[in-house]
């Protein structure tokens, strides 16, 4: 078993209209390795002018976590299979909508990996599909959520 953590910091910074919802949603995420990420609510979900559009929002981070976990397993399974991955780029997306329980959630995430291979042995499409299947089955993050994850290579 492993334990992971993050420190989330927010400051009202003197916002006088706090009771009316007019305060900044900008905050930061700090991680044990020293990384600090500028974060905010999505501008789509809060009053205009209260989000930091340059910050990562929780919905984006959720999609990135699923995508990153899948990629890491995929690359390792490819390596174990004798394949050489040169680059892996995924322009993943997610859909925020009301789910079957009538609660708003990221209900679907679509991964769109583009992979460049090198080396003497290149995987066939069925082998690539199997690598994606195994990566998805073993991804800790995908196994932790009820979101439907689709892979469109």
Question: PLM features: residue spans?
Answer:
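Extended beta-strand/beta-hairpin segments
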Residues: 1-64, 73-153
């Amino acid at each position: 078993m492993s334990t992971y953590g993050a420190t989330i910091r927010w400051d009202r910074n003197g916002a006088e209209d706090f009771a009316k919802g007019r305060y900044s949603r900008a905050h930061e995420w700090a991680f044990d390795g020293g990384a600090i990420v500028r974060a905010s609510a999505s501008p789509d979900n809060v009053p205009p002018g209260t989000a930091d559009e340059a910050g990562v929002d929780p919905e984006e981070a959720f999609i990135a976590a699923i995508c990153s976990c899948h990629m890491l397993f995929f690359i390792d399974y490819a390596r174990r299979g004798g394949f050489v991955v040169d680059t892996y780029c995924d322009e993943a997306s997610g859909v925020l909508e009301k789910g079957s329980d009538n609660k708003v959630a990221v209900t679907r995430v679509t991964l769109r990996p583009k992979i460049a291979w090198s080396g003497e042995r290149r995987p066939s499409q069925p082998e690539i599909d199997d690598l994606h299947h195994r990566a998805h089955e073993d991804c800790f993050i995908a196994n932790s959520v009820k979101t439907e994850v689709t892979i469109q290579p």
